[in-house]
Amino acid sequence: MMIDKILKECSSPFYLYDEEKIKDKISFLNNLDLQFQRKFNFAVKANPNLAILNLIHRSGFGAEVVSAGELFKSLKAGFEPSDIIFDGPGKTEFDLKYAICLLYTSPSPRDKR
């Protein structure tokens, strides 16, 4: 069995995800999405694994982030700035400046200062 092989090859703890199950859950939510005409956003804090974020991005979801690190991961996974919601309490000055530089769009570079 594939899991037995993985267990023998890995000497440290690891997470094992079932991509098909994740896709099934995403498909279910996307069907609700169409029914209620809403777009889902994935809370990156729930699972910042880049492979999972890539899968979620390719499925049409947006990303909800609360820190510069989560924002970085979301952008690296392919989310467009317009598909990222940056909210939550306790943002540091660095988090805010980072988000402004990466998410704020303006025809004038002077506006970002």
Task: List the model feature ranges, each with a label.
Residues 1-103:
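A charged N-terminal "starter" segment
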Residues 104-113:
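Single conserved hydrophobic/aromatic residue that forms the stacking wall/gate
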